[in-house]
Amino acid sequence: MRRIFVGDIHGCREPLERLIGELRFEVGHDELYPVGDLVAKGPDSLGVLSLLADLHANPVIGNHDLAWLRADRIESKSLARWLRQSPVVREFEDLIVVHAGIHPQWSDRRLAQLAASDIAFATNVRYCDEHGVRPHSDWPVPDPPFLPWDKFYRLRRRVVFGHWARRGFDRSDRVIALDSGCVYGGALTAWIAEEDRVVQVPAMAPPRS
């Protein structure tokens, strides 16, 4: 079984279909884990949800997903129910999956019992200080003591996340950042954990020769 993690899709069904093809994804053999923000901004949010549901994907919830659910913007009630079941954090023995980031003061036990007040941090953070206080704005880049949240991350498991298109794809011993700005004309990125391999497709399909 391969665990395949996918960056922010934002309603871009066509690049998602190409990525699935590049991955040679097989339902029942592979497992797909989108890192949230499946909807909004792109041209076919409903199509993205439908495709992911058909593939039995296991997303975490993103800030735009939450906004659409709260505003009742998803026309299909069954797809809305499917999306609403997505957790804020998904845990594996070796990995933590979250849309935006992990608070510096959260423990492994806290991750298993997140409060409603924790959801905003997990789905929105980019910068914070060592206490988890966020700046008023993430742009322009805030001055110290505010740093990228993972500078203060101390748990042992690697974190897979999205949310941060300006940061783009980034990989270190502690994190895998997967939002490569597909909806802005960048790329859609997947990371295959068992192979430690990255697969990307451009936002726009290359012209046919």
Regions found by a protein language model. Give the residues of each.
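Catalytic-core regions built around general acid/base machinery
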Residues: 48-55, 78, 82-85, 149
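Active-site environment of divalent metal-dependent phosphoester hydrolases
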Residues: 10-14, 40-43, 66-69, 90, ...
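Core catalytic region of metal-dependent phosphoesterases/phosphodiesterases
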Residues: 2, 6, 11-74
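Active-site-proximal loop/helix segment associated with metal-binding centers of metalloenzymes
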Residues: 81-87, 92-152
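Conserved beta-sheet core of the metallophosphoesterase superfamily
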Residues: 106, 112, 146-204
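Short hydrophobic-aromatic micro-motifs
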Residues: 5, 59-60, 95-102, 159-161, ...
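Divalent metal-coordination and catalytic microenvironments
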Residues: 8, 37, 52, 62-63, ...
